Amino acid sequence: MISRITDDYEKMAVAGIVALTEPSFWLGEPRKHAGTFYDYFDHITNFEAQRAAEYGIKHYCTIGVNPREANDIDLATEVLTRIEEWFERPSVVAVGELGFDLITDDEETILRRQLEMAFSAGLPVMIHTPHRNKLEGTMRTIKVVQDMDLDPSRILMDHNTEETIEVSHDNGFWCGHTVYPVTKLSPERAAAIFEKYGPDRMMVNSSCDWGPSDPLSVPRTVWRMRREGFSEDVIRKIVWDNPIAFYSISGRVDLQPGWE
């Protein structure tokens, strides 16, 4: 939410959102110094949580070197020398976003190092699947996880589309679906995926970044699912129970399954 205005928090609160998880993100312009990353990590673990709390929203976050910035291998490696300090913050519920952007060897190096750190720290992992060559990037991520003999039930494979959901789901990962006005899923497409694959290990999220994006994508998807006849139990599982179950692996989520 660092790229969004305060009005967005108000709109989210009015729409009934009471908690969110903000993944570590790029800043539009590539960062050039390790200290810029560290200041950003402080921002989303401190100030952003305070900003959300003013609207009654519980703010969690994930910490990681985003794959968009992993190709500056020297800088990314320097950032990783201190990143574990932020893993200990009470609002940090996962390591991420990690993964591939351009699908390079340097990105894989940084991915592997952060996966090792995350599992050592006992934190789950949020994986970014790339905008371009999405299936190739997803398959390479799965290969890395399997090569490292890591438990996929501790990993969220995010930004799935119709192209990737089968391999993500069949390999035992939690499956995120980003509803985004231009480049990712619409509420209708997300609902169609849930209809085909069911609610187990499924989640839906929004994107609140520098381009066209909508912080109300989740309630809009809920509205679409209700119109299409999904039961309240299925909707609740996808947008509430499943995220709580996944992020509770961290031991830091103080929310309960179910809603009134």
Language-model regions, residue ranges each:
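Short helix-capping segments at alpha-helix termini
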Residues: 53-55, 147-151, 196-198, 227-233
